């Protein structure tokens, strides 16, 4: 499988995906099994990334800042890594100072994550904003400045909705 890196400019994904139910998947954070559906009631910024992806390194600091900005408002950033190697995954988390929850897809191979593929992800980083009802509000392709005034205004508006 070949995974392409997205260009570092904002691109919104297909409009047809907005409003669809986010695909549920199981994950384990610090020995605690969970599912994406367990997070209903929260806004989830679901970010697909990998340690070998330079644009993922580029956006990690602003994802940390976004997570800090939204976590007290019933929202979080959740990373899903397409890393086969647990050491590379752990090293990325430490080296980049990642503060938001992350899960390494244990089925990842050939630079691809079955979880990401189930969402239709073909480039990384790619991010899905999942609303409080478990619906995809937005698909964003490529690295972003997650703490830009435009992004923060988007999340302020989304978090102000019921």
Say what each PLM segment does.
Residues 1-24, 162:
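N-terminal targeting signals for export/organelle localization
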Residues 24-44:
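A short beta-strand-turn-helix
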Residues 39-42, 72, 98-99, 121:
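Active-site acidic short loop of glycosyltransferases
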Residues 42-44, 48-52, 123:
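Short pre-active-site segment immediately N-terminal to redox-active cysteine/selenocysteine motifs
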């Amino acid at each position: 499988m070949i995974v392409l890196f997205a260009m570092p400019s904002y691109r919104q994904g297909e409009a047809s995906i907005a409003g669809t139910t986010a695909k549920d998947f199981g994950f384990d954070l610090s020995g605690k099994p969970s599912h994406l559906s367990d997070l209903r009631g929260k806004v989830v910024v679901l970010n697909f990334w990998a340690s070998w992806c330079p644009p993922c390194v580029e956006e990690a600091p602003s994802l940390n800042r976004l997570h800090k900005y939204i976590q007290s408002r019933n929202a979080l950033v959740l990373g899903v890594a397409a890393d086969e190697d647990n050491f590379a995954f752990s090293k990325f988390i430490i080296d980049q100072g990642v503060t938001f929850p992350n899960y390494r897809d244990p089925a990842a191979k050939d630079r691809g994550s079955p979880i990401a593929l189930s969402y239709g992800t073909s480039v990384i980083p790619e991010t899905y904003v999942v609303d409080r009802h478990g619906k995809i509000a937005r698909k964003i392709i490529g690295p972003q400045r997650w703490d830009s005034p435009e992004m923060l205004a988007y999340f302020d508006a989304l978090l102000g909705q019921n």
